[in-house]
């Protein structure tokens, strides 16, 4: 948590409103400059602990630090921009007890239609996680999190959400559960999310910037210009391979970072950078370059292998292969505008039939 006194007080207050005694609330303050310490110091509850870093660690390192501070059986990472329903905590704990044999639990937020409790493992679990990808909503087994070798490097090299690497590591070692708890939803009125929860007004996903069809359309409008900017970074065929491997994460990162650079000075300050106008084209180019730099970094450290790369990155390609037929693939990609793009590149001779 950083410079978000109002959000921290709301989250802590909501959680501690629960009468359940089987959990603790730990706040890791990344050396905030606001009055969050003063406000939280007035909370007297044995379930609550407040820590302030002596220096600013940055978002990723503070996430790791906050998870290390937790002493319970499960670790639940909560972001300062989310709303937590303290009245549902007991229900969540009961479901976690049932899910004890699992390595990770993914929580659907209350703006999504909830289905039955689901168990998956390995690559299936990783694919499921794509659908519910958000840091708030991932609950880790604390013993397994602590046992991840060289865990710190995940928080050093990640360009966005380091818990993705942690989750992939755990998913490949055991079962994962997806449950609907009604505990969390994304903060209403923030710069990153413009659509209120279905609990408040009903959700029309087409109105939000994160709508897949919207961000895909805007992204592909820029692709011709992106291609000319990629000289010396990626060839077009390499871009295609990268796109197929990281389709979901690529588009998500472009849209998230574009919104953050242009609209969110508070969050950018947490990353030590000023707000400035950035085009979607520039974001696409920067993210591709960042992916290339990360790959080089892993190779230099001796932690990069083709097999590990396939496990960590080729999630969507594997999912598409499972559809088996060209017509099935087309039926999925065509509404998103992706099929037209792949067809165009193929006829340029960059994709083999």
Spell out what each predicted region is:
Residues 53-70:
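Glycine-rich, basic loop-to-helix element that forms the pyrophosphate-binding segment
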Residues 120-209:
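Conserved nucleotide-sugar donor-binding catalytic segment
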Residues 83, 87-118:
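Conserved donor NDP-sugar-binding/catalytic core segment of glycosyltransferases
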Residues 269-353:
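Membrane-proximal basic amphipathic "stem/tether" segments
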Residues 29-38, 55, 79:
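A conserved acidic beta->alpha catalytic loop
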Residues 13-22:
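Short, acidic, metal-binding catalytic loop of nucleotide-sugar glycosyltransferases
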Residues 7-9, 34-42:
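Acidic helix N-cap motif at the loop->helix transition within catalytic regions
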Residues 75:
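Short aromatic/hydrophobic "clamp" motif used to bind/position activated sugar donors
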């Amino acid at each position: 948590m950083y410079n978000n006194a109002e959000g921290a007080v709301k989250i802590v207050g909501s959680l501690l409103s629960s009468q359940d005694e089987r959990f603790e609330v730990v706040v890791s303050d990344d050396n905030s400059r606001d009055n969050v310490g003063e406000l939280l110091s007035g909370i007297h509850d044995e379930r609550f602990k407040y820590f302030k870093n002596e220096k600013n660690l940055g978002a990723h390192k503070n996430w790791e630090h906050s998870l290390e501070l937790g002493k319970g059986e499960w670790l639940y990472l909560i972001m300062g921009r989310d709303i937590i329903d303290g009245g549902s905590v007991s229900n969540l704990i009961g479901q976690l007890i049932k899910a004890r044999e699992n390595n990770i639990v993914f929580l659907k937020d209350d703006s999504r239609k909830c289905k039955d409790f689901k168990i998956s493992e390995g690559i299936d679990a990783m694919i499921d996680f794509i659908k519910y990808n958000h840091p708030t909503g991932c609950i880790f087994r604390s013993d397994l999190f602590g046992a991840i070798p060289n865990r710190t490097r995940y928080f050093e090299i990640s360009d966005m959400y380091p818990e993705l690497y942690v989750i992939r590591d755990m998913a490949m070692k055991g079962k994962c559960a997806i449950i609907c708890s009604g505990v969390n939803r994304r903060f209403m009125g923030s710069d990153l999310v413009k659509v209120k929860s279905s609990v408040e007004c009903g959700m029309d996903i087409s109105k939000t910037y994160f709508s897949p069809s919207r961000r895909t359309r805007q992204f592909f409008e820029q692709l011709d210009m992106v291609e000319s900017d990629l000289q010396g970074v990626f060839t077009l065929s390499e871009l295609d391979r990268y796109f197929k491997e990281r389709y979901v994460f690529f588009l998500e990162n472009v849209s998230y970072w574009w919104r953050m650079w242009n609209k969110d000075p508070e969050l950018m300050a947490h990353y030590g950078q000023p707000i400035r106008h950035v085009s979607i084209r520039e974001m696409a180019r920067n993210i591709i370059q960042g992916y290339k730099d990360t790959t080089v970094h892993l190779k230099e450290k001796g932690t990069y292998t083709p097999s590990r790369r396939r496990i960590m990155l080729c999630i969507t390609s594997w999912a598409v292969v499972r559809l088996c037929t060209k017509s099935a693939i087309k039926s999925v990609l065509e509404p998103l505008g992706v099929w037209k793009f792949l067809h165009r590149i193929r006829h340029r001779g960059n994709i083999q039939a």
